[in-house]
């Protein structure tokens, strides 16, 4: 007869299970806000988060932090027996206790109290969960992470590399033998930390040490983690070996029946392949074309597999990148996109069938980033894949994800002042990388779209990416520290943020950000110095800007002598020299600047010698070739000649030199320069033709728009209008000494010209960043509105004045290389 005194744990209500699962799911991601329904669980999860904040991506908490957290942990331990809310939930009780003792062990370890740490680790390890009826899949995942975390610190606390490795090799596969979901970030983190401590060269070594077969996808996954951790290490080509393993898996697989699921071994192998193909994509490594047959067979032997579709997306993009056949290239890219579409469709179906629970939200975000980075509007497929809609869906999904998991998100208004509003968010490494990549992807796609700049979306994207960085140099010994990949990525984000602020004409904030975030820690980051000089050039006194430029030019020359100047820095060197000329012209006059002009051509010849073909181009576009850069120098010279008296022929010769640099490609900047030269020579018909040619190809081209406006406005200027025009001033690159004007047949012809100019300018300020912030555009709009007796002319004139006062000596784009 059963003992009636034995207390049977009640069944946990589904609502409690849901909120506990959501809290654990958020914590596995690295979240910090929890509402599990149990104060004790929330408290210990919060304690764990605060501890990880000082542990993940760093050398551990400082002693004062350790002391505070240890005291809180010990108080929680004392109060465990008094937590009545846990009386009916032994599974939650054991979970709280296990988390707490892991935290205590970590704190004792970082305090150097290794015996105490060992005691806590062993105590945590003895906490077994026997109430299987109360356990959920999320609890199982969380428990697995806690065991692996415990294993990692048991290895460390031994303080012996051989003992540590033996512990890892002996126990890891007993606790985890499949690749975890990417959303299980904490488990991912500790697996990565363990792999970083293992010493091996070949996959075979790794398999032997773990006493398993080399075909094990989890072993292959661990090997790939090591590859990602050692980016500079020589790559060992195992492609054919992996393909053989995959083909062996396929031989044992058949299509599932209605009552069966997809083959686990094949699914697991495809998860490994996602990391492998991502690695080959990043490293631009060509894979065996036979992978195509493997992935097609995988599709044929699975039903709506999320994992196979994502693997196919990566593979087909790799095949596209490495194909020399344009038709095959496009076909493979299309296949990659179609598999992404399937991936999203299968994920949506999973979400609907599993009570609005994602299969793997981080994997989902990662796939979106990948496909958007590797496609464009031209790759849209009618009724299947619309690029712009996909970008919008991605942005919405990313914001929804942050809201669902209560993750800190910087708003548009807050993002205008990073120094005041920034928060450091610490997540597991794989989570941080995926989310940083996601925000960066949105920025790169939308960085040229005016509406996202004006609405502060761009600064918001960059701030949310910057918050995720866990690696940054200390101020001390800056020059002696070698910069890692994460630090380089953060520095680039900080530059883009400063650049975006400068684009918005938040000049003072941009200056503070450059000086505080970048230049104090990266004194040799030349493009940041160039941006700072351009921002300082807004000030009436140009001396500060000039000093910055001269100082940086000296530093770059030293780097050139030491042969440490990178290709993009060579482009920066030329443009910095041109900025110096612009400042000399502003401070000392055009003739003084012209005397310095030959130095630019000498510098170009030194930086880009014909004997070094690797310096010929920064990328596949013509605008990335050294010939295009030389054309820019000649155009700069031509514009400078136009601003002096009686130098029309020199300007004409410079434009001709620019045109002769490269005959295969027509540079529209030559047309623009010819247009302005024609204005000076009083040839309005020729000028109009040149500007119309440019506007045909680029309807928002600022220089062509302003040139076109000059031909129409004003026909006659009164004294007051002349003074106003002198105030707003055309940019230094375009200031003709004479005025050519179009001759209109009649009033209808004149009105049509006004109407067209109005249309072009109004379209430009809605679509073009350069046009929107151009004082010239707002000046001509104010003249048009005044002609039409439109009150908007007052607002346009105010914007003209505002943006003239904030106008740098040269366009900001010249520092962004």
Swiss-Prot record:
It comes from the Eukaryota. GO terms for cellular component: plasma membrane. One of its GO terms (biological process) is endocytosis. It is found in: Cytoplasmic granule; Cell membrane. Keywords: Cell membrane, Endocytosis, Membrane. InterPro entries: Endocytosis_PI4K-reg_protein, TPR-like_helical_dom_sf. Gene3D superfamilies: Tetratricopeptide repeat domain. The keyword Cell membrane applies. It is a peripheral membrane protein. Interacts with STT4 and ribosomes. Involved in endocytosis. Belongs to the YPP1 family. This is Cargo-transport protein YPP1. The gene is YPP1.
């Amino acid at each position: 007869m059963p003992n009636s005194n034995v207390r049977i744990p009640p069944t946990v209500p589904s609502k409690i299970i849901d909120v506990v699962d959501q809290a654990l799911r958020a914590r596995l991601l690295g979240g910090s806000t929890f509402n599990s329904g149990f104060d004790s669980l929330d408290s210990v999860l919060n304690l764990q988060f605060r501890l990880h904040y000082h542990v993940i991506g760093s050398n551990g908490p400082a002693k004062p932090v350790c002391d505070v957290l240890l005291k809180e942990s010990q108080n929680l331990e004392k109060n465990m027996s008094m937590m009545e809310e846990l009386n009916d939930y032994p599974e939650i009780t054991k979970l709280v206790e296990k988390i707490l003792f892991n935290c205590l062990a970590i704190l004792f370890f970082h305090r150097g109290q290794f015996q105490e740490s060992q005691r806590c680790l062993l105590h945590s390890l003895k906490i077994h969960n026997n109430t299987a009826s109360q356990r959920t899949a999320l609890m199982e995942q969380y428990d697995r992470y806690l065991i692996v975390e415990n294993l990692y610190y048991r290895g460390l606390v031994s303080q012996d590399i051989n003992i540590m490795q033996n512990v890892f090799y002996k126990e890891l596969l007993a606790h985890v033998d499949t690749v975890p979901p990417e959303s299980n970030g904490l488990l991912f983190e500790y697996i990565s930390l363990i792999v970083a401590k293992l010493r091996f060269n070949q996959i075979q070594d790794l398999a032997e040490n773990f006493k398993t077969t080399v075909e094990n996808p989890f072993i292959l996954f661990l090997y790939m983690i090591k590859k990602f951790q050692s980016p500079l290490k020589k790559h060992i080509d195992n492609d054919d070996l992996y393909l053989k393993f995959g083909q062996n898996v396929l031989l044992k697989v058949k299509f599932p029946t209605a009552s069966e699921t997809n083959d686990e071994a094949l699914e697991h192998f495809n998860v490994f392949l996602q990391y492998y193909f991502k690695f080959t994509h990043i490293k631009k490594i060509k894979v065996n074309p036979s992978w195509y047959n493997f992935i097609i067979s995988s599709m044929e032997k699975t039903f709506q597999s999320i994992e196979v579709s994502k693997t196919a997306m990566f593979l087909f993009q790799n095949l596209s990148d490495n194909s020399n056949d344009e038709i095959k290239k496009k076909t493979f890219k299309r296949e990659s996109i179609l598999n992404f579409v399937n991936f999203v469709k299968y994920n949506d179906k999973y979400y609907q069938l599993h009570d609005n629970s994602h299969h793997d939200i981080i994997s989902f975000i990662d796939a979106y980033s990948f496909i958007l980075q590797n496609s464009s509007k031209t790759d849209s497929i009618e009724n299947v894949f619309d690029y712009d809609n996909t970008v919008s869906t991605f942005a919405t999904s990313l914001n929804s994800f942050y809201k669902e998991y209560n993750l800190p998100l910087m708003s548009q208004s807050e993002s205008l002042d990073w120094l005041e509003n920034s928060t450091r968010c610490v997540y597991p490494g794989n989570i941080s990388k995926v989310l940083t990549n996601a925000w960066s992807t949105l920025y790169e796609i939308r960085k040229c779209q005016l509406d996202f700049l004006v609405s502060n979306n761009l600064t918001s994207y960059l701030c949310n990416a910057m918050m995720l960085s866990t690696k940054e140099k200390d101020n001390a010994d800056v020059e002696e520290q070698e910069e890692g990949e994460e630090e380089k990525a953060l520095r680039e984000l900080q530059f883009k943020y400063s650049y975006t602020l400068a684009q918005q004409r938040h000049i003072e904030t941009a200056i503070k950000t450059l000086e505080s975030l970048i230049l104090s820690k990266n004194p040799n980051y030349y493009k940041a110095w160039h941006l700072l000089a351009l921002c300082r050039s807004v000030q009436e006194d140009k001396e500060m800007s000039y000093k910055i430029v001269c100082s940086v030019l000296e530093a770059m020359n030293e780097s050139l002598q030491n042969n440490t100047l990178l290709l993009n820095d060579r482009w920066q060197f030329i443009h910095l020299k041109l900025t110096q000329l612009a400042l000399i012209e502003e401070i000392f006059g055009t003739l003084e600047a012209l005397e310095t002009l030959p130095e630019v051509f000498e510098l170009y010849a030194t930086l880009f010698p014909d004997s070094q073909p690797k310096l010929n181009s920064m990328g596949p576009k013509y605008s990335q070739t050294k010939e295009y850069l030389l054309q820019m120098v000649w155009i700069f010279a031509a514009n400078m000649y136009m601003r002096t008296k009686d130098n029309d022929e020199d300007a004409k010769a410079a434009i001709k030199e620019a045109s002769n640099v490269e005959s295969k490609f027509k540079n529209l900047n030559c047309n623009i320069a010819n247009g302005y030269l024609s204005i000076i020579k009083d040839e309005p018909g020729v000028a109009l033709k040149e500007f119309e040619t440019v506007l045909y190809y680029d309807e928002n081209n600022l220089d062509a728009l302003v040139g076109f406006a000059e031909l129409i406005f004003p026909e006659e200027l009164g004294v007051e209008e002349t003074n106003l025009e002198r105030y707003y001033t055309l940019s230094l690159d375009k200031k003709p000494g004479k005025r050519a004007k179009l001759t209109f047949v009649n009033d209808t012809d004149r009105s049509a010209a006004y109407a067209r100019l109005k249309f072009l300018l109004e379209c430009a300020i809605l679509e073009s960043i350069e046009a929107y912030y151009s004082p010239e555009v707002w000046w001509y709009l104010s003249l048009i509105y005044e002609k039409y007796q439109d009150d908007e002319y007052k607002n346009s004139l105010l914007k003209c004045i505002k943006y003239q006062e904030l106008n740098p000596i040269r366009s900001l784009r010249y520092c962004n290389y």
